[in-house]
Amino acid sequence: MITITGLTKTYGCRRVLDGLDISAAPGQITLLVGANGCGKTTTLRQVCGLSSPDAGRVVIGTSDLAASPRAALAQLSFLPQSPRFHPKLTAGDILEFYARLRGLPSSRIAAVEAQWGLADARDQATARLSGGTRQRLALAVLSLPDAPVLVLDEPGLSLDPDWRRFLYAELRAAARRGATVLVATHLLGEWNGQADRCLALEAGRVGRELPSARLLDAFPFARSRPALVHAG
């Protein structure tokens, strides 16, 4: 469960979040959509403790992020919009590092490596990986701890259509197992019908809520927008 109450964040003279209230429930995929600059990424950064709000509260499970950050963040796994890895480390090095950080066994590394099709990339430096393979590596890192709360910023970017479909299926499976899944995206056509709830951010708040099956009705411009697919 993620509960956001009265979240406010200002950068310079610009208020990006203005008393934002959001809840994301276990067993559901909650989608954040909206125009560029509406606060999607800022919201996720607040949830993950990467930036502090000017006001408001974030609770993950039953743990207040400000009062008990370690307990709150231990429940969470985060995929940033543009994952970065040390260019000289291999994909295997990256997975081993994050597994050790979480105290996970090598069997868990093997499981996510197989899940995200990374066996051939294991010994390759991340600088030599295609954009799609790097994104799958980031998704493997996200999947390592099997966390009860998943937070993803534009997870479908750089993936080819088959891997996108696999990603959506994996997130639905995680939700069925009881995970809380919070996703920010602008790929509205890709996500039409994929989520349980869709929250449209406007002027730093939730402007409206709609079923994700109605995304293309609510945002008709997405029907003609070409799919942003970068194969790899």
PLM features per residue range, with description:
Residues 2, 17-19, 73:
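Conserved structural motif at the start of ABC-family nucleotide-binding domains
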Residues 48:
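Helix-to-loop junction immediately C-terminal to a conserved catalytic motif
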Residues 96, 106-121:
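Conserved ABC ATPase "signature" region
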Residues 150-154:
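Catalytic Walker B motif of ABC-type/P-loop ATPase nucleotide-binding domains
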Residues 161-163:
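Helix N-cap at the start of a conserved alpha-helix in ABC-type nucleotide-binding domains
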